[in-house]
Amino acid sequence: MNKELASKFLSSIKHEREQDIQTTSRLLTTLSIQQLVQNGLAINNIHLENIRSGLIGKLYMELGPNLAVNDKIQRGDIKVGDIVLVRPAKTKVNTKTKPKVKKVSEDSNGEQAECSGVVYKMSDTQITIALEESQDVIATTFYSYSKLYILKTTNVVTYNRMESTMRKLSEISSPIQDKIIQYLVNERPFIPNTNSFQNIKSFLNPNLNDSQKTAINFAINNDLTIIHGPPGTGKTFTLIELIQQLLIKNPEERILICGPSNISVDTILERLTPLVPNNLLLRIGHPARLLDSNKRHSLDILSKKNTIVKDISQEIDKLIQENKKLKNYKQRKENWNEIKLLRKDLKKREFKTIKDLIIQSRIVVTTLHGSSSRELCSLYRDDPNFQLFDTLIIDEVSQAMEPQCWIPLIAHQNQFHKLVLAGDNKQLPPTIKTEDDKNVIHNLETTLFDRIIKIFPKRDMVKFLNVQYRMNQKIMEFPSHSMYNGKLLADATVANRLLIDLPTVDATPSEDDDDTKIPLIWYDTQGDEFQETADEATILGSKYNEGEIAIVKEHIENLRSFNVPENSIGVISPYNAQVSHLKKLIHDELKLTDIEISTVDGFQGREKDVIILSLVRSNEKFEVGFLKEERRLNVAMTRPRRQLVVVGNIEVLQRCGNKYLKSWSEWCEENADVRYPNIDDYL
């Protein structure tokens, strides 16, 4: 079974990689820099501020905004962990997506004018790119350019790691020794533990509900658990309690916590920080959110605290800074040779420090890809039988392709005696680039969560969290019935909460038509004046709807008149073009920069007091595109706490031939405050 599974995934990953590279290459060779920026694939108007040494052969290039153009970096869709190219603004965009380095004209001393690296840190005022130290000479030449730009490219490292993992899975000979792998390849039946089941006597968090306690007790007593956490059900709090209870039961327990993205694991890291002794918690990789609580656990930062390591690093940084001032190419070359010798010494000392930090920790937090990092796996080179981990926890498992989830299982084979998966298979699936092969799409969209419940139809290992602490009951009702078999309950503390209950809101309690008292509003945009438009500036002509934008603006201004805070409002649209147009109006023209505007993907895992959802699609053919994706809409409609405002054409949803959309729009006609706007009132 392991060979069949690996073979299926290897062919699917190969196809997905090819599609990804072709798509990215086509975009980079056909679109201008400005178009790439508009589509979130590039960042321009930046310059080099600093270069410094990083961890184990890394070089950090720190880039800031060009203040003559803007005081903030327009980040687009580029995020921590992305592979990017950094180039001077005069370099042409025309490129293949493989990380290559180009020569520029002889007046630049023949040096190369392109660097490839990984986005290590990001903020509105600085981007840090981690480069291999072999690019040091090239990187230094960028000081002489006033403008640089960044291009997002295909992350081939990710595909390489998944393929390598699948090959290793196929090579495991029978009989398989690893009990967890036996479950996952359907070579071992799952029988829940009933003989030695021990309930936890005392929970540390007094606010846990019964479903959370049941999930924790089950996970403590069984070697395979899926914690199914719908929106707002406190999945992360459940995991935090589980981790603490594992350490209480066995203080020597070693836990690896993984997730598909930096943000997914940083959320757990932030919550664990005040509850676990600092020396027991270690973060490997690139923290996406640069909170002090995350920094203090970063392997990079902790290893730099070693005095000798610190001294050598400072000496290297000093020489790098000197190189900025050297005009003579020969002198610069000599300087780099000295830096290389220092780096060799630094690398040896860093490995020793890193090994000590990993061994003293009890909880290691990293992404799924980071779980096979050389820092962790180097411990097995010294001692193949070294017991590094006991428990593996994968959070947001439904956002990861299954081959990603195998990376820690194969990298640390025969280590884990317990696997806990947490997530919600009714929210966004992993992002798949393939569009031309249904088998590949099915293979890669079917998550480990989905496949396990298919292998074990009794679902004995699935523990459902049934109380949500986010949404007003009326907002929760349709998602609960359509996606969770009506099992979701609204906690009493949130069931009836409204915008009027916010301390800043100064609405009049006696006025019934006040928007702050209504949890669910739908602006029905039927009619020719609310037709969608294809935006030619965006990839594949993404759609936008000017009439809907006008309604969104009016509703925001109405909420602001009641003093609903800007940062309590979020605007979501499935379409990039609509998001772009909304940002231009609300952020640039109205200067309401604290209102968050994003696609559905950008809001997963987030929440706001009020969400305005702009559906965009309004056409005579009743085409709905993205809106057919139930899980995408489920995410959008479960983000708000106190008010959900939908702006969209009800007739299109009811006549598009999609049962889910028809059911939703009909339910809203009965349960929402439906309004029929006249475009003349908004112009």
From Swiss-Prot:
Question: What induces this protein's gene, according to its Swiss-Prot or TrEMBL record?
Answer: By heat shock.
Molecular function via GO: 5'-3' DNA helicase activity; ATP binding; ATP hydrolysis activity; double-stranded DNA helicase activity; RNA binding; single-stranded DNA binding
Which superkingdom is the protein from?
A: Eukaryota
Keyword Cytoplasm on entry:
yes
UniProt EC number:
3.6.4.12
| Catalytic reactions on record | ATP + H2O = ADP + phosphate + H(+)
Xref: CDD domains: DEXXQc_SMUBP2 (cd18044), SF1_C_Upf1 (cd18808)
**More info:** Present with 1040 molecules/cell in log phase SD medium.
User: What is the role of the protein in this entry?
Assistant: DNA polymerase alpha-associated DNA helicase which may be involved in DNA replication.
Q: How does it assemble?
A: Associates with the hexameric DNA polymerase alpha.
Q: What is this protein called?
A: DNA polymerase alpha-associated DNA helicase A
Q: Which gene encodes it?
A: HCS1
